[in-house]
A protein has these predicted regions:
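Short, polar/charged alpha-helical segment
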Residues: 49-56, 73-93
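Short N-terminal micro-motifs specific to bacterial/archaeal maturation
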Residues: 14, 37-40, 44, 95, ...
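Gram-negative bacterial Sec-dependent N-terminal signal peptides
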Residues: 1-23
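Ligand-binding clamshell of periplasmic/extracellular solute-binding protein-like
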Residues: 69-79, 96-125
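A common structural microfeature
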Residues: 62-64, 91-94, 118-119
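Immediate post-signal peptide segment of exported/extracytoplasmic ligand-binding proteins
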Residues: 23-67, 87-88
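Generic structural signal for beta-strand residues in well-ordered domains
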Residues: 7, 16, 58-60, 87, ...
Length: 125
């Protein structure tokens, strides 16, 4: 369940974004079978949810987004595992950088002060 919740949260958070990938229902099924178990949802319910993500991401397929997170184990899992799942399922490539908490804050401040888009999303727990 934890893996499923993390995957759903990551996919939802990353759909905001800003170049090379293809959405794939077969990939969604592979991830459901091999990584997103156990889950409180049945595999059919999970696939229905993944189909929604594939459809929602369709206009953005082939895009590439940059995400910054602080260095904690949850974010390492997101960076190492869920970014691959996200790209295979949605067609959106995620460049996920992990830095220390202070560096994340500094990056956010820099982006706000300069108006220069450094990252498309920030993940902070």
């Amino acid at each position: 369940m934890r893996k499923y919740l993390l995957s759903a949260a990551a996919v939802t958070a990353l759909l905001a974004g800003s170049t090379t990938a293809m959405a794939d229902e077969a990939a969604a099924q592979r991830w459901i079978d091999q990584e997103f178990q156990p889950s409180t949802l049945s595999k059919d319910e999970q696939l229905a949810e993944m189909q929604w993500f594939i459809s929602a991401a369709e206009p953005y397929s082939g895009m590439e987004i940059n995400v910054l997170s602080e260095g904690i184990p949850t974010h390492s899992y997101e960076s190492e595992v869920l970014t691959k799942a996200f790209e295979e399922i949605t067609g959106i490539k995620v460049n996920h950088q992990i830095l220390g908490e202070g560096e994340v804050v500094q990056a956010v401040q820099t982006q706000m002060q300069t108006g220069r888009n450094l990252y498309d999303a920030y993940v902070n727990d």
